[in-house]
């Protein structure tokens, strides 16, 4: 299912905070540090793990690293970056096999991109993962071609 990916230069699981964090270098037209984070959130009275990714930047006020999910790098390697991000899902479920991952883009266009990836690879995703979408105030089983505000992914029970 997944094409070429970048190697991770850092993988970190912080048990006390329940956060899983990956760092890699996008090596397109420039070298851009990228980060992927799975962090616990609560939405509609349910616990999920937000799957966030973007450029790894330093907060000018605190000096701490954070994920900038609004900048568009336009680095010429979008497929490799996207495949690298997707590759972290199976690693996440090794730590949290019963969890549900929440996917929502920082804007509508990005959420559509994530949905189109699932549409394209649905035949390869569906045997392993349960995918649901939130629309019109309800969580429903994923149907290719349907618009959703956000997506939820969990590992299928074996």
Please report, for each region that a protein language model flagged, where it lies by residue.
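Non-catalytic substrate-recognition and accessory regions of acyl/acetyltransferase enzymes
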Residues: 1-158
